[in-house]
Structures are given as C-alpha cells and as structure tokens.
Amino acid sequence: MFWWYYRSPARVVDPSNPWPIILWLQGGPGGSGVGFGNFAEIGPLDLNLKPRNLTWLIKADLLFVDSPVGTGFSYVDDENLLVTTDEESATDLTTLLKAIFNGNETLQKSPLFIVAESYGGKFAATLGVSALNAIEAGELKLQLGGVALGDSWISPEDFVFSWGPLLKDVSRFDNNGLSGANSLAQQIQRQIQEGKYVDATNTWGELENFVLDNSNEVDFYNFLLDSSQESTDPEVNQVPKRLLLEVYSKFISSKMFPSKGASSTPDLGTLMNGPIRQKLKIIPSNVTWDGLKGYLESSRTPLYCGQDDPITKGFFRSYKNLFFYWILGAGHFVPVDQPCVSLQMVGSITRSPNTNSTF
C-alpha cells in the first residue's frame, strides 16, 4: 500500500495535549487520497504545487493512503488479493497502521483521527472497529483519537430517498421529478433489502441520470451549481474526473459493487457505544447510541471564520462523544469550498494544540 506522511512544522511536544495525526481516507471507492485529498483539498501544496494557505497540516500531521489496493500507487502482484469488501479493506489498513506505528514510539504518543470523505466514510467506520479490536488485543500500538465522517456514503437508502425532496425544496425538481426520483429510490431500497447490491448500484446510476435530465444537470458535488459551473477552485472542477473516474482500477467497477450498496450503520453503532472517545460527524437515526436523546435536545452553536467575520459559516452541536457539523455554502468538497471554517472544525475535532490558522 502506498502512503504519504507529512510531519507538521507546527508540531509541539505537550504530554497534556498531544499533537494529533489525521489519517485521510478518500472516497470512490478508487479515489486517490495521496492525489486528490492531498493536492486538491487539504495537503500543504495545491494542484499547481503552490503552498496552500489553509492546509490541515497547520493543525495536525497528515497521513494519506491510496486505499483499497488497486487505487493510485497501491497494487498487488496477484489480482486474487484485491479486496472485495469493506472489511477486507479495513484489514489491509489495520495491517498498514501496525507497520507504521508499532515500531515508532514518537507516533504512538499522538492520537490518530480517521477522517474520511464520501465513500471513505464506509471504510472509516469499518477501520475504526478493526483498529479498536487490534488495539484491545495488543496487536496495534496507537491511540485512536476519533473517527470523523464527512458527507459519507454510509447508508445508501437514506441518501437516495433524500435527493428528491432536497431538489424539490431548492426548485430543481417539480412534482414529477420528485415522484420519479422517489420511485427509483424505492426500487434501490428493495434491491438492497434483497441483497442485490449490484442491481442496486445500477439503479443508483439510473437515478443519477434521472436527476441530471430533470434538474437541467445540477452539479452532483454541489447542488447550488450546474454541472457545467466551476467549483470554488477552478482546478478542482476537473479533478474528480481525472482522479475519481479515469484512474479507477478495473476491480473497482466489479469487485467492490456489492459493498457500495451495503450500509455501514452496524459499525457506527459499535463505535458510538464503544469505550473510546471518538467524534463522529454523523449518526443516522437507526444507529443505537445511549446519548441520542441528550444530543437531540442540545443547542447548536454558530461558526464564524475569524473574530472579525460576522458571516455565519455553519453550526455545530455536540454531546458526549458525538460532534456534528453543518458547513454552509459548501458542496461535497468542504475543505475546497470553505477552507477557513473547515480548518477550524478539524482543529476542534482533533483538539490540536495549535489554536492559530498559520504555522
């Protein structure tokens, strides 16, 4: 497995508030964390290899991995070793963490936060359980600080049923569009319940085409835009096509299809009710958690970007080991659309000793 580790220039040694490490997991499946997450979103250099002003390296060390194997520069000599499930991917990642952390006492002192985007959230939830089990068994020497899921594909049924009402609310759909989208979502739900994950994935593709045809091609990465419009960063508009589509290895479209339609909510339940102090960014209603009532009754806190900026950038709500963030004015790639407030968010999640927005 190919990985890239950045040690932050801002790293400080403080036993009472240890410096965090972020493991970034990209989506897809098949998106390169080393390529996309690193250069297009949060790494120290942008796509033009210019310094990124609001890199997450300000708040934590960064560890990017091309996962699962077959993605980016990660490969196998025997195609029979390519993973076919999220659990197998988590096993590979846990093995990698053992190789990186078990022999490095310095890294062992830093809490590891698994931060994921899109389909990476399914990997993150499963990896969180796998890593926790390895830690408790004495096989993995690291501190698991938390798991953060960003707009993650963890419950396909919930997401596809949300598309129609959302697009109707923002006037991208009329009643006919809403009805058609809901009909396809119901078909996906039936196929998932019957274990027909490949069929469900194909119907999901039909739903995407339906959305494009009936919304005048809304941007799937940001419903505030047309698909032809550029993202906040013009370069990023083309990156998903280059890194998330064209470089898919052949196993992505065949061997991982069953996992794409499956839910990760059992793994979330294990994490939420586990003994570790982790901070998930989303909890579906069907995940059992003994703090849910208190969380729902707590108030939201507004987020701003700097003391002198009066514009509301989002909200967050927290209770016990759950932190939930709403980021305004952002699409699927939050660090790109709202880099300032996302940097504040990740600093809070990881309890970074660096309270500044610079090195």
Regions found by a protein language model. Give the residues of each.
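Terminal and linker regions of secretory-pathway proteins
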Residues: M1-F359
